[in-house]
């Protein structure tokens, strides 16, 4: 993927009590994650997490917007082109340089409701729930 943009509008209804964040968008390589867009309800913020080296476990986090509560609308776009990723979250734009280890790596966008809570042993109804009202991937 070279020069594509994921645009989405979502509302986060809940985040599992066993998790402290919910991933609402990402760029993923064939075997490793490249970039995550994460909502953290305790901090009322949205962060961008970028994995510095392809296949590595070192990541950097940057808070991109604050004051976001459960039930609020989050509108975002993630644009990846060449050696740059640009995010726009609720109107706030940030740009990130991409390490050369990602050059030529096939990647794809993912959106949804991903959380770090265990998949078993959770009380009934304890879930991360995100609704998307719009999304698109464009060149």
State what each model feature region is:
Residues 50-75:
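Short, aromatic/His-centered strand-loop micro-motif at the edge of beta-sheets
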Residues 1-46, 138:
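Secretory/extracellular carbohydrate-interaction modules
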Residues 48-50, 87:
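Short hydrophobic/aromatic-rich beta-strand segments that constitute the beta-sheet cores
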């Amino acid at each position: 993927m070279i020069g594509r943009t994921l645009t989405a509008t979502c509302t986060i209804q809940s985040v599992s009590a066993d998790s402290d964040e919910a991933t609402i968008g990402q760029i993923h390589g064939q075997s490793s994650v490249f970039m995550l867009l994460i909502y953290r309800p305790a901090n009322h913020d949205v962060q961008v997490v970028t994995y510095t080296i392809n296949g590595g476990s070192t990541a950097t986090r940057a808070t991109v917007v604050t004051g976001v509560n459960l039930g609020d609308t989050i509108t975002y776009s993630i644009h990846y082109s060449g050696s740059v990723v640009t995010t726009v979250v609720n109107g706030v734009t940030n740009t990130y340089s991409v390490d050369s280890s990602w050059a030529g790596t096939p990647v794809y966008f993912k959106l949804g409701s991903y959380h770090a809570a265990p998949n078993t042993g959770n009380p009934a109804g304890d879930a991360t729930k995100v609704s998307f009202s719009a999304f698109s991937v464009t060149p």
